[in-house]
Design a protein with these regions (language model features):
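FIC/Doc superfamily catalytic core
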Residues: 1-334
Length: 334
């Protein structure tokens, strides 16, 4: 299944702008944002995506939950947050083109909140706002086949991944594959897909920009439904993605730590040996003293091994995972 849409001038311009900004992100080493920024953005993502669905917890309350502090709030809201923390911590584990993985994420996200989380619905559902039915989802007996077609589209179609991620988000909202939790799953899985385009999207709070334009978000979803065409929604989401990258670049004055730089450099070099000069060529804005300090700290932690002395020193990453790998550090932070 391929959602009908048109390639407009706006879509072309936004894709070009996003591609340009990804280049700037890579040049500034922001595809793995600093630890504190990652934590801050992850909290914003969770809070915004859940608030769209009516969750009442604030950023401060979610931060308190992450720090194992007591929070006075509805039990359901607290459970939604705890589930979302687990799901977003496992983003790298999900298989973006797998329906099974998609359902597993829903199972975790909605555990204790709905009956049979992770199960594709078999009943008919509609969305009611006030006394008005705003959307009648496809009949339950065809939902599984619609999802199969949708995942086949992800795997086989030659569309750009940026467009595919928007189409998928829209189609999840339209198909309404679960009895509840469809909105947050559409937003979550677009992030899972965007990670394939660039790792920066793992910690980019796209949901917070959607929340800021929530009325427009639902309005454009409704218009796309009525028109049977997802062009408007694709334009809307590409603009959100572009704006989120722009915000990251504007606020890039958060300093990288030595651990951040070492992790970034490891991704670039792998197991190849290197010198301090090689390290400084990657990070042109640091002094030789800072470079030496970074490398010494990594050596003292057992991350690096070295041979030679002074100017002839050669470094190499040991054949084991860094103690401060991104996933470990984020899980510790959260």
């Amino acid at each position: 299944m391929k959602s009908p849409y048109q390639i407009t001038n706006k879509i072309v311009e936004l894709i070009a702008s996003i591609s340009e900004k990804i280049g700037e992100v890579n040049s500034a080493h922001l595809y793995r944002p600093p630890t504190e920024l990652r934590k801050k953005n992850r909290i914003k993502t969770i809070q915004s995506s859940l608030e769209i669905e009516g969750n009442t917890l604030s950023i401060e309350q979610i931060t308190a939950i992450l720090e194992n502090k007591k929070v006075v709030a509805p039990k359901k809201d607290i459970l939604e947050v705890k589930n979302a923390i687990i799901v977003y911590n496992r983003l790298a584990d999900y298989k973006p083109y797998s329906l099974t993985s998609f359902c597993k994420a829903h199972e975790i996200l909605m555990k204790g909140i709905v009956d049979n989380p992770g199960s594709i619905r078999s009943k008919s559902v509609g969305i009611i706002k006030g006394s008005v039915i705003t959307h009648v989802a496809p009949p339950g007996n065809i939902v599984r086949s619609l999802l199969k077609d949708l995942f086949d589209y992800l795997k086989k179609d030659k569309d750009l991944l940026l467009i595919k991620s928007c189409v998928f988000h829209y189609e999840v909202e339209f198909i309404h594959p679960f009895m509840d939790g469809n909105g947050r799953m559409g937003r979550l899985w677009q992030t899972v897909l965007l990670r394939q385009y660039s790792p920066v999207f793992e910690f980019l709070p796209i949901e917070s920009l959607i929340k800021a334009k929530q009325l427009d978000y639902y309005k454009i979803l409704g218009e796309s439904d009525n028109q049977g065409d997802s062009t408007g929604f694709i334009e809307f989401m590409l603009q959100i993605i572009n704006d989120s990258l722009e915000d990251l670049l504007i606020n890039q004055n958060v300093n990288l730590t030595s651990d951040d730089r070492i992790n970034i450099f490891k991704e670039k070099t792998g197991s190849d040996s290197f010198t301090r000069q090689d390290y400084m060529r990657q990070f042109k804005d640091i002094s030789s003293a800072t470079a030496s300090r970074d490398l010494k700290e990594a050596f003292d932690k057992g991350t690096l091994e070295k041979t030679g002395d002074k100017r002839t020193t050669q470094y190499r990453f040991k054949n084991k995972k860094l103690n401060t790998t991104l996933s470990t550090r984020i899980q510790n932070a959260l």
